[in-house]
């Protein structure tokens, strides 16, 4: 007889897994630990997620959606000024490291933990980072940067360095200079402009 899933079970599992993955790293946490922490039986867990790989993938996918909602919101605050929107992405990244419990960037961390290119969680993490790079390049193109792809790549390096430094040396260390570094970089690659309501240069 097939048991009917209890409403909220999937959410409960994901919330518990997210906490454990953040505290111990996704690779170090086993399915049995998730079972014990949720208080659910193994059958309930495996009914929602057929394997740990699938659980990690779902966790990263959920973080991906949450991160993009925040990035889109940061960008939307500077509509019509793509150069300022580029800086807003870095500002958002810096703000996200202010939490004293921050452990770096989940997407970079997951990619480092699961080295197999075919791992579902790693694929989700890499997809997020590739989309971020593409978004930065598109904004740089809209801002008429001299070399949009180069500017996007250098901003990606600032963002990754920001997360790494904030996690090790704290948000008040070198990470605190990330926005200033990004501003200098953007100013060097984007000609001076006056944004118009349509987002075009005057």
Could you tell me what each predicted segment is?
Residues 58, 72-103, 142, 152-155:
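Hydrophobic alpha-helical connector segments
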Residues 1-24, 28-40, 54-57:
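Basic, helix-initiating cap at the start of DNA-binding domains
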Residues 118-127, 141-202:
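Hydrophobic/aromatic-rich alpha-helical bundle segments in the mid-to-C-terminal region
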Residues 46-49, 53, 113:
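A short His-aromatic
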Residues 85, 99-120:
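Amphipathic alpha-helical segments used for helix-helix packing
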Residues 60, 64, 122-130:
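Amphipathic, non-transmembrane alpha-helical scaffold segments
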Residues 56-63, 70:
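Alpha-helical DNA-contacting segments of helix-turn-helix folds
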């Amino acid at each position: 007889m097939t048991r009917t899933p209890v409403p909220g079970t999937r959410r409960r599992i994901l919330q518990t897994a997210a906490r454990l993955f953040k505290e111990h790293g996704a690779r170090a946490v086993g399915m049995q630990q998730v079972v014990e922490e949720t208080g659910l039986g193994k059958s309930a867990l495996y009914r929602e997620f057929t394997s740990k790989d699938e659980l990690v993938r779902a966790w990263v996918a959920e973080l991906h959606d949450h991160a993009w909602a925040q990035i889109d919101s940061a960008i939307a605050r500077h509509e019509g000024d793509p150069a300022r929107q580029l800086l807003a992405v870095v500002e958002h990244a810096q703000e996200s490291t202010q939490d004293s419990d921050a452990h770096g960037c989940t997407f970079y961390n997951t990619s480092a933990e699961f080295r197999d290119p075919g791992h579902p969680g790693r694929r989700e993490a890499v997809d997020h980072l590739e989309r971020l790079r593409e978004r930065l390049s598109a904004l740089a193109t809209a801002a008429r940067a001299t070399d949009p792809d180069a500017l996007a790549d250098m901003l990606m390096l600032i963002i990754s360095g920001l997360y790494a430094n904030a996690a090790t040396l704290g948000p008040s260390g070198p990470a605190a200079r990330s926005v200033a570094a990004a501003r200098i970089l953007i100013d060097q690659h984007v000609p001076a402009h006056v944004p118009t309501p349509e987002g075009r240069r005057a």
